[in-house]
């Protein structure tokens, strides 16, 4: 009985070794795209999806996100109490600043955000006055930018695990 088990074990070992050695050559990756190229930060940023396309570092302490849900008659959710659940709504185009500690996709209010707004000219603290329409919005993992038409300024933010700039 031991001889039969030993014979089968030896045969199986030889076949396994041969199967690993031979066969077709290893496949080469001819596609030069990276997995990061398939990420769309704008998924879930409308219809109260509560996500944002900001500069966010995975598992990091910092998330620099655009705030655009208040301040303009063109914003569809400005007078709706539900806008408190998210700092960003894709269909709105009135930018009021960057928040640095918002979470994405939590589905509940995140109040008390300190907004930073790049502006030029006289200081104005009324968000309906200092806010600006924007265009040329771009986002990728860890990066967000837009162009503020009122101030003729391109804004860019990025995040690392412990800081955002």
Where are these regions (language model features)?
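Positively charged n-region of N-terminal signal peptides that target proteins for export
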Residues: 1-4
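General helical structural elements
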Residues: 6-7, 86
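Bacterial N-terminal signal peptides
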Residues: 7-16
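Bacterial Sec-dependent signal peptides at the C-terminal "C-region" and cleavage site
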Residues: 16-28
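Accessory carbohydrate-recognition regions in carbohydrate-active enzymes
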Residues: 25-165
């Amino acid at each position: 009985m031991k001889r039969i088990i030993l014979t089968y074990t030896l045969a199986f070992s030889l076949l396994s070794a041969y199967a690993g050695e031979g066969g077709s050559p290893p496949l080469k990756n001819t596609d030069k795209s990276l997995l990061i190229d398939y990420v769309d930060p704008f998924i879930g940023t409308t219809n109260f999806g509560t996500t944002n396309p900001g500069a966010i570092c995975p598992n990091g302490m910092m998330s620099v996100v655009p705030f655009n849900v208040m301040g303009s008659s063109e914003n569809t959710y400005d007078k709706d109490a539900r806008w408190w659940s998210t700092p960003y709504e894709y269909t709105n185009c009135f930018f009021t600043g960057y928040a640095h500690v918002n979470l994405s996709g939590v589905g509940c209010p995140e109040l008390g955000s300190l907004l930073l707004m790049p502006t030029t000219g006289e200081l104005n603290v009324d968000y309906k006055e200092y806010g600006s329409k924007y265009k040329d919005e771009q986002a990728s993992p860890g990066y967000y930018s837009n162009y503020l038409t009122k101030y003729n300024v391109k804004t860019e933010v990025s995040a690392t695990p412990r800081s955002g700039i």
